[in-house]
């Protein structure tokens, strides 16, 4: 079996190793999770790609837009500890790599919503499973400084 799309790989792994499940049990909630992941990819990962490969002006505009959009959703993290959920899910797994790279991308979280978003990031980044998933290069992005 050869899989190549990150979401397909993540769902396959969740089904292959189902304990604990990272996708909701109920079909409607599963569909919502898939929509959230699609939106994260379409809206935010595309901005990350522009920051990394666009012109300086395009990167600056994408950096600003990404910061504003992330801060705009921050209130959801006052209602539930994870992305619209009481439980850590595949949506959190999908969003975490982007959030981990924010300092390298030059995206600084300041202003309204920053505290809530940083609290969410801390909850995700302190999970043993997240830390175990980091490559050496990813670890250096945040942990290897100093």
Model feature map: region roles:
Residues 3, 33, 92-93, 127:
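Short, thiol/selenol-centered motifs that function as redox-active sites or metal-ligating centers
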Residues 1-75, 81:
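GST-like domain detector, emphasizing the conserved glutathione-binding G-site
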Residues 43, 83-108, 112-113, 118-124, ...:
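GST superfamily/GST-like fold recognition
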Residues 17, 113-116, 139:
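Extended, non-catalytic scaffold segments that flank or surround catalytic motifs
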Residues 13-14, 120, 141-143:
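Short secondary-structure boundary/hinge segments and terminal tails
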Residues 136-146:
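Acidic/histidine-enriched, glycine/proline-rich intrinsically disordered or flexible terminal extensions
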Residues 14-18, 41, 78, 103-107, ...:
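Hydrophobic/aromatic-lined pockets within catalytic cores
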